[in-house]
C-alpha cells in the first residue's frame, strides 16, 4: 500500500516508528506536512497539491496532527478522505476528541464515569461554579490546554476563585473539575487500537506536581489494568469514533474515571515502557481495514 503520514515533524519518535513499521511490511510511505498541503475543491477535479506537485492517491493516511493545527490539519485529512484514502482516525473523530467540552458531553451521555466537571466562559457566580463540582480542592484547566499546560490545582476556595478570575481575564473557556486526591498524582494511559487495549502504563507525577504527563517530568511503569478499566477505555474511544486513542483513566474510590481521550497519542513513552510494538499494530489495523475506494463510495 501507499501510505501518507501527516505530521509537521517527521523526526519525532512516533513518526519514525510508524515509518519503520510500515516499511518493514513492504509499504511505501511519505511524510507530509499538512500545513504545506493545498487543495483544489471542485465537483469533478478535487485534488491535493504539496510543494508544487499534485499528490498521487494514497491508500491510507495516518494523521499525527498537533492540537495547534487541528483546523487546517483535519481539513487536509478530510480532503484525503474525500479522494478515497482510508484514515487511521477520521477527521470528524479527531475534531470531536479535540473539543474537550463536546467529548466530555458525549462520554457522559454514554454513561462513562467522569470526574465532576463544570465548564464556563465568564461565570457571573464563581462560588456557584466551584460548588457545582463539590468545592475545593479542585482542578482548573484551560479548555484549549494540552500536555498539562494551563492546568492548576486550587487547594482552597479562595485559591480556586483567584485562578478562575485570572483565567477569565484571558478570555478563555474554563474547565473546573473535582480533584481526585486518592489518585495521588497517578493515572493510567490505555492505548486503544480498534477494539483492543494493546498496552497500558501507569504514569506518576514528579514530586511536588499532580500532573502525570510524561512531558511534565512524570515517570511511567507497566500497568496491570482491570477488565472494567479495559472496557471503559475501549468504550470511550468508540464513543468518539476513534480507531486509535490514548485514554487517560484515574483510579478513584468510586471506580475508574475517564479524564481525557487523546486522538493522537504519543508512542515513545508507552512503547519504551511496555516493549509493545504499537506502531506495528497500527499498521496492521490499516492493512485489515483500508478498503480501496471506501470513502469514494460513502462520501467521506
From Swiss-Prot:
Q: What SUPFAM superfamilies does its record include?
A: Glutathione synthetase ATP-binding domain-like
Q: GO cellular component terms?
A: cytoplasm
Residue ranges constituting the ATP-grasp domain according to the UniProt record: 104-287
Q: Cofactor note, please?
A: Binds 2 magnesium or manganese ions per subunit.
Which InterPro entries does this entry report, sorted A to Z? ATP-grasp (IPR011761), ATP-grasp_RimK-type (IPR013651), ATP_grasp_subdomain_1 (IPR013815), RimK (IPR023533), Rimk_N (IPR041107), Rp_bS6_RimK/Lys_biosynth_LsyX (IPR004666)
Q: Provide a Gene Ontology MF annotation, just one.
A: ribosomal S6-glutamic acid ligase activity
- Please tell me where ATP binds in this chain: 141, 178-179, 187, 211-213
Q: What class of enzyme is it?
A: ligase
Residues involved in Mn(2+) 2 binding: 260, 262
Gene3D superfamilies referenced in this protein's UniProt entry, alphabetically? 3.40.50.20, ATP-grasp fold, A domain, ATP-grasp fold, B domain
Q: Where does Mg(2+) 1 bind?
A: 248, 260
The name this protein carries in UniProt is Probable alpha-L-glutamate ligase
Task: Choose any GO biological process term that the UniProt entry carries and state it.
Answer: protein modification process
Amino acid at each position: 500500500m501507499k501510505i501518507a503520514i501527516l505530521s509537521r515533524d517527521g523526526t519525532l519518535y512516533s513518526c519514525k516508528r510508524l515509518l519503520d513499521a510500515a516499511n518493514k511490511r513492504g509499504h511505501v510511505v511519505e511524510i507530509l506536512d499538512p500545513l504545506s498541503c493545498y487543495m483544489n475543491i471542485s465537483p469533478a477535479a478535487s485534488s491535493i497539491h504539496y510543494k508544487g506537485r499534485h499528490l498521487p492517491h494514497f491508500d491510507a493516511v495516518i494523521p499525527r496532527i498537533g492540537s495547534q493545527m487541528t483546523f487546517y490539519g483535519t481539513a487536509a485529512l478530510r480532503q484525503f478522505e474525500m479522494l478515497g484514502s482510508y484514515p487511521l482516525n477520521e477527521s470528524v473523530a479527531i475534531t470531536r476528541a479535540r473539543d474537550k467540552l463536546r467529548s466530555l458531553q458525549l462520554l457522559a451521555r454514554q454513561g462513562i464515569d467522569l470526574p465532576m466537571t463544570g465548564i464556563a466562559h465568564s461565570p457571573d457566580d464563581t462560588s456557584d461554579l466551584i460548588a457545582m463540582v463539590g468545592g475545593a480542592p479542585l482542578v482548573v484547566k484551560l479548555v484549549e490546554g494540552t500536555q498539562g499546560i494551563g492546568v492548576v490545582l486550587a487547594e482552597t476556595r479562595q485559591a480556586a476563585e483567584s485562578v478562575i478570575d485570572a483565567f477569565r481575564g484571558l478570555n478563555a473557556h474554563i474547565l473546573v473539575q473535582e480533584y481526585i486526591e486518592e489518585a495521588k498524582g497517578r493515572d493510567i494511559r490505555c492505548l486503544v487500537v480498534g477494539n483492543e487495549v494493546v498496552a497500558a502504563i501507569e504514569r506518576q507525577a514528579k514530586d511536588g506536581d499532580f500532573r502525570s504527563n510524561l512531558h511534565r517530568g512524570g515517570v511511567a511503569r507497566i500497568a496491570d489494568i482491570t477488565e472494567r478499566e479495559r472496557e471503559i477505555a475501549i468504550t470511550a474511544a468508540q464513543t468518539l469514533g476513534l480507531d486509535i486513542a490514548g485514554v487517560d483513566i484515574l483510579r478513584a474510590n468510586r471506580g475508574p474515571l475517564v479524564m481525557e481521550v487523546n486522538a493522537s497519542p504519543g508512542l515513545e513513552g508507552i512503547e519504551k515502557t511496555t516493549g509493545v510494538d504499537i506502531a506495528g499494530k497500527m499498521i496492521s489495523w490499516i492493512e485489515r481495514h483500508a478498503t480501496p475506494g471506501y470513502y469514494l463510495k460513502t462520501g467521506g
